[in-house]
Amino acid sequence: MSLNSRFVDLALCACLAVCFPRTFCACDASDDTDFPKSVALAKKTNRPLLLAFLGTDWSISSLKLDREVFDQAAFADDSKYNYLLCKLHFYQTQERSPEIVRQNEDLAERYHIEQFPTVVVLSPDGGELGRLGYIPGGVDKFAAAVNTLLAKSRSSSP
């Protein structure tokens, strides 16, 4: 294989990794959809949990939130220390296991989800602290909104 073709292969891989970061993520992408595991980890690590109710294959705002915020390395770095993310997908065109579909529908009913996307912010013990939707401006704006919500909940708790 020539040096030129190796360079082309490397450049193609780099482009794919940038365009589709979850595909090239070293972590198991399915982990962030496991609600019981996410709740247990939030308690264990004493971090808030973001429950993201998403319809990424039919809701433009859900798709934007997922691509502009959740799929960005900067969000992963911030959330690694400050909070956890659990994505709950409501696909219309993709198949999901019946267990995941049931879990997500039950959670949408429990939290009275009426629009997508909705991000329910939970305390480490499971209490609801607030809600967010899509916020234009990428990771910085979204993380600032989450941090503001968390600061308000801390200042109002006894």
Model-derived segments and spans:
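N-terminal "domain-start" segment that seeds a small globular fold
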Residues: 24-40
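Thiol-based oxidoreductase modules, predominantly thioredoxin-like and allied folds used
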Residues: 31-32, 72-102
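Bacterial N-terminal signal peptides that target proteins for export
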Residues: 2-12
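Local sequence-structure signature of Cys/Sec-based thiol-disulfide redox active-site neighborhoods
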Residues: 37-71, 75
